[in-house]
Amino acid sequence: MDRVKRVIHCDRAYKMGLNGKNITVAVMDTGIAPHLDFDQRILHFEDFCQKKLAAYDDNGHGTHVAGIIGGSGLMSKDKRGVQLLSGVAPRVRFVVLKVL
């Protein structure tokens, strides 16, 4: 992720205060697993496959995609407390539609 963020110049956006705050992204994929890196930013989950009510991901792909987009990096801290990884827009909110 760090390499990708360098290639697409995320540092420029971050310096301008652009980090996903007040932005909502729809992820249409295999779902999303509740995770501390999404720290209550999943606004809505809709399951079009099995009609379950609670957020889940029975494949992992949707959670991976959501992490790339907006994982906070909270769970990637090293022993010193230094955050190692985060998504491109770590403050974004999610609407997740399980379609696969």
Protein language model annotation of sequence segments:
Residues 1-15:
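Autoinhibitory propeptides
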Residues 2-6, 28, 70:
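Functionally constrained cores in energy, signaling, and assembly domains
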Residues 14-25, 32-44, 52-100:
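Subtilisin-like serine protease catalytic core
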